[in-house]
């Protein structure tokens, strides 16, 4: 009994006695919290909307106390630039919550310091413009296959369903080719998600893609034990109910199969003293495994980093393309402008990265999609590695930092009619250079999205192939398609139906 009371007393002191961090952060505005829990229970299940609401009340720099974790939320283009560009070294590290230590902090997203730099450099060596361009045929083939399957699945009224799921199939195949190479398990199978007679391989692929979506949804929830460790049993119950661990196991099993397949191949080549000749590129897993075999990184980093890349590349890009298509369907005049620009300026099927400059309106549509839908609305949190001043407020070393990309992309301070889809804002506006800088959907600073260049090329190529060959329209023109996504770690586009017609 005495030990229990003593333990309770120590815990209470731990939460109630002001720390160095809280003393420094005390002048930052924010909502008044409760003892021990702080502001945790003032954040509802829709974390993104809660963060947005606090921004509207307290401004671009505000403080939250989440259990025993001091947190500062940064919003607004100028605030994010001051923080992650001009003070980039103060915010380069990730704040690794307990729920993110599922990979022991050895993956490319959650690692820090020199080890993270090694993982990042390995990836970037495979993302040169020339190597990205070399994926054109594979991307184009997957886009055409997906579009053909959509067209074949239309009913008598030319209506197709499950568009977002088909997008995810396509992106899963593209990311498998990028990460694991042409011989990756499943990557050469069809995309037809509407076929009821799929073989076992396609059924397993469907299950993997479903697990990716559900994993992202669960990961976007608030895990209370990240901030109050004693609540871990309750979180574990909820995570089990939401299949968090089951989904993660499905993903790691798939990645492990492909990684071990490539490792065996590399070992065979090394044993036979075989060297590759004349290859323009390596798969991502091959690049990581070579560094593992040289003793530069741990095998766990190969597995977890490939899992990171597969997750992020599949779900975020698929949802971006799905939202883009929704906007083109709801705004048919914009879709026709994109089509006319493509057929006028791109005469052949060879699409390079530089061809984006020939299609400014198409690029404006893509930028507007990134702005309006903010696929990664809060990104992953950062760690403040030293005391720093932002917008006149002192932020203490050790503070968790959140990039509020969602509110920054929808603030009336930076955008006219921020909730409307207006690509022309990137073309007609006199201050176009400033507007281009305002696209923060890939994050800012040293920890911005490492796959940005590949994603931009892949999205551009997909839009060109789809809109050049097909016209998409609303089966019920008087009822616009739903443009509001489901919030999680990424914004998920709801499935929708559309009419599809081949262009003449």
From Swiss-Prot:
It holds the Pfam family p450. The keyword Ion transport does not apply. Its cofactor is heme. The chain crosses the membrane at residues 1-21. It comes from the Eukaryota. Gene3D superfamilies: Cytochrome P450 (1.10.630.10). GO terms for molecular function: heme binding; iron ion binding; monooxygenase activity; oxidoreductase activity, acting on paired donors, with incorporation or reduction of molecular oxygen. InterPro entries: Cyt_P450, Cyt_P450_CS, Cyt_P450_E_grp-I, Cyt_P450_sf. Heme binds at residue 449. GO terms for cellular component: membrane. It is found in: Membrane. Keywords: Heme, Iron, Membrane, Metal-binding, Monooxygenase, Oxidoreductase, Transmembrane, Transmembrane helix. Its EC number is 1.14.-.-. It is a single-pass membrane protein. Belongs to the cytochrome P450 family. This is Probable cytochrome P450 513F1. The gene is cyp513F1.
């Amino acid at each position: 009994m005495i030990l229990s009371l003593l333990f309770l007393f120590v815990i209470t002191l731990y939460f109630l006695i002001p720390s160095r961090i809280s003393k420094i952060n005390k002048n930052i505005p924010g909502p008044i919290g409760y003892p021990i829990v702080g502001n945790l229970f003032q954040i509802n299940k829709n974390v993104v909307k809660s963060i947005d609401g606090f921004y509207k009340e307290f401004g671009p720099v505000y403080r939250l106390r989440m259990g025993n974790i001091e947190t500062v939320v940064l919003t607004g283009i100028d605030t994010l630039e001051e923080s992650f560009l001009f003070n980039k070294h103060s915010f380069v590290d990730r704040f690794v919550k307990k729920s993110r230590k599922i990979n022991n902090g050895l993956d490319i997203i959650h690692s820090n310091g020199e080890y993270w730099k090694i993982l990042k450099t390995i990836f970037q060596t495979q993302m040169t413009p020339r190597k990205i361009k070399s994926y054109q045929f594979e991307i184009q083939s997957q886009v055409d296959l997906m579009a053909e399957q959509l067209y074949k699945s239309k009913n008598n009224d030319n209506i197709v369903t499950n568009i977002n799921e088909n997008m995810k199939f396509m992106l899963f195949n593209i990311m498998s080719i990028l990460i694991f190479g042409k011989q990756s398990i499943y990557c050469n199978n069809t995309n037809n998600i509407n076929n009821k007679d799929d073989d076992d391989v396609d059924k397993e692929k469907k299950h993997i893609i479903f697990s990716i979506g559900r994993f992202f949804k669960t990961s976007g929830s608030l895990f209370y034990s990240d901030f109050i460790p004693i609540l871990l049993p309750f979180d574990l119950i909820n995570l089990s109910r939401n299949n968090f661990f089951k989904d993660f196991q499905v993903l790691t099993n798939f990645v492990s199969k492909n990684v071990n397949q490539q490792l065996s191949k590399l070992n065979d080549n090394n044993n036979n003293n075989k060297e590759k000749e004349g290859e323009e590129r390596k798969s991502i897993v091959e690049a990581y495994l070579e560094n593992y075999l040289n003793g530069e990184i741990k095998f766990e980093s190969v597995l977890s980093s490939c899992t990171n890349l597969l997750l992020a590349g599949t779900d975020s890009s698929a949802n971006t393309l799905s939202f883009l298509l929704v906007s083109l369907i709801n705004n048919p005049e914009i879709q026709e402008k994109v089509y006319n620009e493509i057929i006028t300026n791109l005469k052949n099927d060879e699409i390079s990265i530089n061809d984006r400059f020939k299609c400014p309106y198409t690029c404006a549509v893509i930028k507007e999609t990134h702005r309006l839908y903010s696929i990664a609305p809060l990104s992953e949190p950062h760690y403040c590695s030293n005391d720093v001043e932002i917008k006149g407020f002192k932020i203490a070393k050790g503070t968790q930092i959140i990039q509020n990309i969602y509110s920054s992309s929808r603030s009336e301070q930076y955008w006219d009619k921020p909730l409307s889809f207006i690509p022309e804002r990137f073309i007609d506006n006199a201050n176009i250079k400033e507007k281009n800088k305002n696209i923060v959907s890939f994050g800012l600073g040293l920890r911005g999205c490492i796959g940005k260049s590949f994603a931009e090329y892949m999205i551009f190529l997909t839009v060109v192939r789809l809109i050049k060959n097909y016209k998409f329209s609303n089966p019920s023109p008087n009822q616009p398609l739903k443009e509001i996504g489901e919030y999680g770690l990424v914004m998920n586009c709801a499935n929708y139906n559309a009419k599809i017609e081949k262009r003449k």
